């Protein structure tokens, strides 16, 4: 396995997606602009060139602005469902069929896909080792 980077920036995760208000955004499932994001004390959003704040369950991720993005020009907007899913390492072909609010709740409650995969692979490998050891022991 290749060594993992200590972290990934928000831009690394979502930087190749088009602006959700552009015509190109329609080509990406669940990539729809949601208006209303505002900065206020304790609600500041994630910066593109830093790791994303934790995606919290719920539409707005209050408190802390976790489900909000600070753009390069200083403007803020809510993450799209697709952007939130990317941050949680869902594949782009994973389709969320619920409303924006419910989809954001599902993503915020989810274990990141790549983390679940790593844990599952580790558990599987250890169980396999135990099984092999038991078989060797029982054959002696």
Each language-model region and where it sits:
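Flexible, glycine-/basic-rich loop-and-beta segments that form/coincide
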Residues: 1-27
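C-terminal target-recognition/interaction regions appended to catalytic cores
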Residues: 17-140
């Amino acid at each position: 396995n290749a060594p993992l980077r200590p972290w990934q920036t928000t831009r690394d995760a979502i930087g190749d997606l088009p602006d959700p208000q552009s015509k190109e955004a329609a080509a990406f499932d669940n990539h729809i602009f949601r208006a209303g994001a505002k900065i206020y004390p304790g609600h500041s959003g994630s910066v593109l060139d830093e790791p994303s704040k934790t995606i919290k369950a719920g539409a707005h991720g209050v408190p802390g602005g976790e489900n909000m993005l600070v753009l390069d020009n200083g403007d803020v907007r809510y993450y799209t469902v697709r952007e939130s899913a990317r941050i949680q390492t869902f594949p782009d072909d994973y389709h969320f069929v619920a409303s924006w609010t419910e989809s954001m709740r599902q993503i915020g409650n989810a274990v990141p896909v790549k983390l679940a995969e790593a844990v599952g692979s580790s558990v599987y490998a250890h169980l396999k080792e135990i099984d092999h050891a038991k078989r060797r022991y029982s054959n002696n």
